[in-house]
Amino acid sequence: MRSEQVLKDYYSGKLAQRIQLRKLELAYPPQPENEVKIRVSESSVGDPTEREVLSRVMDLRLATLERRLMCVEKFLRECERVDQRILHLRYRKEYQWVKVAMDVNYSRRTCIRRHNNLLIELSKYLAWEE
């Protein structure tokens, strides 16, 4: 996944939303129905809990989304204050580059250059995912 799309998903809240949806999918998996409606139950007392824990541990999709979220948060913590502001204005508030530049008192070109450098740095954080 491209680093710019990861930032868009993070700032729009889609990344956190995907994590919550995946947790719900794991907590309440779809029940397969057969024509006879026979329910096979296991006698183990802790089995539902055990299944839930194992499915969460083994779920690669959820782990990938959570790692992506942690990587973005760590990346943003380590960024300079002005770079955080540029990303916030660009992705959270969806400002055009001219308005971002006016807000941080840099030229439009400098903001774009810093943004491009940030995307390269973020892609290094996310490199192990791909």
Predicted regions and their residues:
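Helix-turn-helix DNA-binding module
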Residues: 93-110
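N-terminal interaction/assembly modules
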Residues: 1-75, 99, 128-130
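Short amphipathic alpha helix immediately N-terminal
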Residues: 78-95
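C-terminal flanking helix
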Residues: 117-126
